[in-house]
Structures are given as structure tokens and as C-alpha cells.
Amino acid sequence: MDPLETQELVGKSPTDSSKQALPISEQDQGRQSSETCARASPLSIFMEPFQWLQMLSSQLNPTFIFGVVVVYGLSQGFSGSFFKVVTDFYWKDVQKVQPSAVQLYIGLYYIPWVMKPIWGLLTDVFPVRGYKRRPYFLVAGVLGCVSALMVATLGKVPIAVALSCLIGITAGVAIADVTIDACIAKNSIEIRSLAPDMQSLCGICSSLGALIGYSSSGFFASLVLLAVPPTILIVLGFVIYEVRSTTLQSEKKKDLQIALRGMSKTIKLPQVWKPSLYMYLSLALSISTHEGQFYWYTYPKAGPAFSQEFVGMIYAVGALASIAGVLIYQKTLKDYPFRSLLLYAQLLYGMTGMLDVIFFLRWNLVIGIPDYFFVIMEECVSRIISRIRWIPMIVLSTRLCPLGIEGTFFALLMCIDSLGSLSSKWGGGIVLHLFHVTRTDFTNLWLAILIRNFLRFATIGLIFLVPKGDQEDDLIPPDILTANSDASLDDDGLELAPVKETSEEARLLLDEENSLKLK
């Protein structure tokens, strides 16, 4: 909203009638002045993201912002993207595994993510020396660093050993993710209007980290680089601000019982299990055929024979497109209701999947579009749509979390999403195996992709499971939302910056801060 409009809506009073009676010429001058302000200088446009970050830091603790940057930017963004490219070539060129088998192995990467409720439960009710968040950042960093150094220095090892090390890397990322997500969920409940902004910050950090990771993966194939983000997680565990908990050992059992009882009661609500079921099915039914496609477009005798450097560049451009998707959501879509937004996002998601069929059948060459241009265009479109589809589901998840067990319950919802991703990988692996897609035979790959696209369109029929509410609405009853707030909430995790205003004053303050947001 324009700052002038905000002031009119917030500060308008009956005494403003004199302002409404201004002569036409003065109104024209005021309109011209506002139009001049609207035509912002390049410097002001450049400063908008920094002003947005300043606004978030003023409402949230700055070390929380730093934690989001480290976890989402480095641990998930950089490490996840670099990991994806390097391990794909590792399984293909070093271990020489069939694509359907790689799909099953990649599905095992999601085991630490499926265990997120356990990590969330630990962070909520089992503080270490009085701290609920710091120790788990340290554990995540040490686990990820040791696993990365092992797989990087041991060379070619048995598949079981390599798989264990790679799962260890993803476990470090998952533990760090659930720890920072607990803070995000808590802040999203306490300052509802900032929930979309926090998810936009996560998305931008993740995309920027992915851009760096994909760009470097084509030229630096060493797995040693995967030890860098966990090392910074260790640093984060020492510097992040957290109030020390005063919970006694005898109270931990009570908190655990409250958490389990609260989770059981909340997940049974139709307002919760219906959108959770939709999120699972929307991921599981979109079966993954990535490994079959990867083997095809890097195989010289069948596909376009892309090099590792070009594959990294494709994903890097896709990371830029992901940032564009975040900006599109932040500027135009964050105020739309959940159901209508996810309906159109899923429809576009199915339509973009048909680009893979066109590429595999080489119809792009028939119409004169080179492979390298078409694949980059397809990557950009699919990344933008995927990001627009994904962010509302994360915001929806934060709106379903009750206070006091927000870390545990958000982890449970993310566990459901991880189960959906695991089902997608394994389902895709089974389809690739049934259609006899191997390292050298890709005859039926297009049929597997076509089935995937059909399932994406079929998911639209489940959209009734998504609530119609806006992205700032309370989706669960107030008694459930605050039922667990006595579970050591007074010393829970990362603190918000102290805000003493009443609810009305806080609303006016946020209205004024809207002028600093990315628009």
C-alpha cells in the first residue's frame, strides 16, 4: 500500500473534511507530488530490500534474522544445491548406479526430515543446560561437518557407507532447519502480519544460497565444500541470542505430556488434518522422474549431452528464477486466500510439466528452439511456479501451529511434507523401473513424465481440503491456539524485540511499516 494511502486509512477523522475541500489545483499539485514520489529513484529501489530487513529486525530479534540467513541461505540453499548436483554425478559416474536405484537412495535422504517431529520435540521440551535452540545448532553443525569430511576424504566406498554419510549430511541440515523453524512458527503466531514476510525472507535466502551452490557445483566438484555450512552452524550455536530456560528436570516430563497431548488434539481438528492431507498428496502424487531425466540429458548417445558445468548453470539460472518467484509472491500474491492461490498454482504446475515432454521428444528442435535455450527457459518457468506453489503451503503450516508446541507441531507438518517428498521419489523410482528406464535406455521416459503430469492435474480435485481463509487469519480455534501456552512459553527460544504497544497501537505501527516492505 502507498504510504499516503496508509496515512489516510489510519489517521482519517471527521476533522479531515477541510482537506477534502481543497481546490482542484491544489489536489492536482498533490497528485503530481505523489506521482513524483512514486517514480522512485534507482537508489531508493536499491535500498528497499535493506529497509525491509530493517523493518524485520525492528520487529524481530536481529540474531533470529541472522539464523534464518545461515540456515536457509547456507545450510539449505548452498549446501542443498551443491549437494544435489555433486551427488547426482557421484552416483552416476563414481558408483555407476541405475537411475531407478538412485531415486530410491535419494528417498532415504528424507529419513532425517521425516524424523523432524523428534527433533522438534527435543527442541521444545528438552533444553540442554537451560538452552532449547543453541545446542541443537551445535549438534547439527558437528554431524554435518563430520559426515561431509568422511565422504569427501574416503574416496570410493561401499554404497552403504556412502549413503550413510550423505544421510548424515542431510540430518545436520534437518536438525538446523527444525530448530530455526520453531522460532519462525512462534514469531508467526505472535506477529501474524509478518508470517508471509518471514517466509519470503526464507525463500530469498534459500534461493540466493542455491544460486551460489549451483554456480560453483559445475566447477568445484569436491564434496569437501559441503563441510563449510555446518561449520558456520557451529558458530551460530554460540552467537545466537537465547534466554536461558529455568525449567526443572521434573517439569520436562510434564512438558512432554503437554506437547504430545496438544499435538494429538490439534491434528484431529478438520481445520488441521484436511490441509495437512492436501500438502502430503500434492507432493506424493507429483512423482519425481528427475534421475531419469538427468541421466538422459547427460548421456551423449541419447540426449543433448550436457556437461557438468552446464548442468550447474541450468540450476543456477533456476535459482534466480526462484528469487523471482519469491518476489512475485511477496509483491502480488501474499494477500490472496489460500485456496484460490493454491488452485491456480497447482494448475500452472501441471501445465509447466508438459515442457519436459516437449523437451524429451525434441519438439523444441522442430520449432527451431535450441536445447540449451529451451532447457533454461523450462527451468525458469518451473522454478517460479514451484516457489509460488510452495510458499503458501509453508505459510499455511505456520498458521496451524498452537502456541507452546509450535516447534514440535510445525516439525510434524514438515514431516508430513517430507513423507510426501519421499513418496514422490520412491513412486518415481518404481515408475522408472516399471518402464525399464536405465542408464542407457530411455525409450519410455516420456511416458513416465506424462504420468507424472497427469497426477499433477489430478491433484486439483483435492483443493477442497485447503481452507478458504486469508493468509493472516487464525485457522484453528482460539482455545486450541493457546491451550499449550503454559508449557515453558515464558522462556522459550529466541525472544522477539520488546514491543510494549497495545494491540491497536501495534496494528498502527505495522501499517506504517508497510511502506518499508518490498512492494
How should each PLM-predicted stretch be described?
Residues 138-157, 347-368:
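C-terminal ends and interior cores of transmembrane alpha-helices
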Residues 74, 147-149, 154-176, 365-392, ...:
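Hydrophobic core of transmembrane alpha-helices in multi-pass small-molecule transporters
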Residues 1-64, 146, 152-163, 171, ...:
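Intracellular loop-helix junctions on the cytosolic face of multi-pass helical membrane proteins
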Residues 63, 67-68, 96-111, 193-201, ...:
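Loop-to-transmembrane helix entry
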Residues 109-117, 193-221, 315-319, 414-427:
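Glycine-rich segments within core transmembrane alpha-helices of 12-TM secondary carriers
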Residues 112-120, 311-336, 345-357, 421-424:
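Transmembrane alpha-helices of Major Facilitator/SLC transporters
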Residues 130-135, 218-229, 337-340, 430-457:
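A membrane-interface helix-boundary motif in multi-pass transporters
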Residues 99-100, 189-202, 308-309, 373, ...:
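Loop-to-transmembrane helix entry/capping segments in MFS-fold secondary transporters
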